[in-house]
A protein has these predicted regions:
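Acidic Gly/Asp/Thr-rich repetitive segments characteristic of extracellular carbohydrate-active
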Residues: 3-43, 47, 347, 361-364, ...
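Right-handed parallel beta-helix/beta-spiral solenoid domain characteristic of secreted/periplasmic
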Residues: 10-23, 36, 51-100, 326-330
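Parallel beta-helix/beta-solenoid
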Residues: 30, 52-61, 64, 79-124, 148-155, 189-192, ...
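Extracellular beta-strand/beta-solenoid scaffold signature
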Residues: 70-81, 97-108, 123-141, 162-180, ...
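Predominantly extracellular beta-rich ligand-binding scaffolds that present long acidic/polar faces
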Residues: 220-224, 236-237, 242-341
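C-terminal accessory segments
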Residues: 325-380
Length: 381
């Protein structure tokens, strides 16, 4: 997916071209300021934080691969944080080589309306984006609301090794792409995730939402060779949380080869899993969609599951509507590379979906007239 260009800065702009200048600009940023980073490879000496409202940190060129913030020489396990501010935008740059968290959202300090757009998140060995727990005191006011993670590429060159992270608590499997708690009204869309894998293939989700996350939309993402594709919830509960995800929707996503689960829902309420395409005919766990424990009001509809299908381990009554379970390898454009667009051979999916008012477009934002099952709508029928 191609990101739209950022608008020109409205407030003051600061141009930086050295590591020292970048660190100073971030830590001294004033509200409304734009920090434009010249093309280059910046070995960060330590963790830094944005702490002012409406700050934009971006590459000057708009080319995300030309500005690299590298944590390989930092003594800290985290690279770039956001604290006690609203309206921050981080865009058009790369972060890489971080032991723990690449982008750290200090959610307990009242971080709101953060946008991370058109970034590359590369070789981050715990979480590419981490939003931490929010304490009970004032939680409803300070939980992170209205954030957006869009048009980013998350990828690792190889599975995680124990040597990458001495703090790993899961035998080398403590790894995910995005992991956020107590989120509300987020949009996670148009991202690509490749190779987010633990040392034994038991990592967390490429996208992992939990701890009373509410009304979030996860759509038009492409996930390839990650241990778990999309994870709504977790078997572990604490802090008096009854449901991990409430009123969230996952729609129009492509997921290819996610051996632990393509999409898993655990302790959810009124969530919807709609029009996703999941391809993993050799799935070792046979759970392209997995539902576990309570999933009250869950709707799983019009998903194309190219492989062994679903595993329902839930105690709740779930609506399963119009899902197609069949190896569709020969009906996709290029399934080996994760391109799950339909071809004319997908006769069992074309025009066979139940019309849903929640999904009027497909993964390419093409209008669904007579809807097809899965994330793609074949236009030339």
């Amino acid at each position: 997916p191609t990101a739209p260009p950022l608008p020109e800065p409205h407030g003051a702009a600061v141009d930086v071209s050295t590591v020292e200048g970048l660190v100073a600009a971030v830590e001294q940023a004033q509200a409304g300021q734009t920090i434009r980073v010249a093309d280059g490879h910046y070995f960060m000496p330590r963790y830094v934080e944005i702490r002012a409202d409406n700050v934009t940190l971006r590459s000057a060129s708009g080319q995300r691969h030309r500005v690299v913030l590298d944590g390989a020489r930092s003594p800290h396990g985290e690279l770039l944080g956001v604290r006690a501010c609203s309206g921050v935008t981080i865009a058009d740059l790369t972060i890489q080589n971080v032991r723990w968290n690449g982008f750290k959202i200090n959610s307990e300090t009242n971080v709101q309306k953060l946008t991370i757009c058109n970034c590359i998140i590369h070789n981050i060995w715990q979480r590419g984006v981490k939003g931490v727990k929010v304490p009970p005191e004032g939680r409803e006011a300070i939980r992170p609301k209205g954030c957006r993670i869009q048009y980013c590429l998350f990828y690792n060159d190889r599975p995680k090794r124990l040597a990458d992270d001495s703090a790993d608590i899961a035998n080398g499997n403590y790894i995910a792409g995005i992991d956020v708690m107590y989120a509300r009204d987020w949009v996670i869309s148009d991202n690509v995730f490749v190779g987010i894998q633990g040392s034994t293939g038991e990592g967390r989700g490429a996208i992992f939402l939990w701890f009373d996350t509410q009304r979030c939309t996860v759509e038009r993402n492409i996930i390839i060779d990650c241990d778990v594709g999309l994870q709504l919830g977790n078997p572990h509960r604490a802090d008096g949380v009854e449901y991990h995800c409430v009123g969230c929707v996952a729609r129009n996503n492509f997921i290819t080869r996610a051996p632990e689960a393509g999409i898993v829902t655990v302790y959810t309420k009124d969530c919807r899993v709609l029009h996703n395409t999941i391809h993993d005919p050799a799935s070792r766990m046979s759970r392209l969609i997995r539902t576990v424990f309570a999933n009250d009001g869950l709707v799983v509809a019009n998903n194309l599951l190219s492989g062994p299908g679903m595993r329902n381990e839930s105690d709740s009554k779930i609506e399963f509507i119009g899902n197609l379970i069949k190896d569709m390898t020969s009906a996709f454009a290029d399934p080996a590379s994760g391109n799950l667009h339909l071809t004319q051979a997908a006769t069992e999916a074309i025009d066979k979906a139940v019309p849903l008012p929640d999904v009027m477009e497909d993964i390419d934002r093409q209008l669904r007239i007579k809807p097809d099952i899965g994330a793609d709508e074949l236009v030339d029928k």
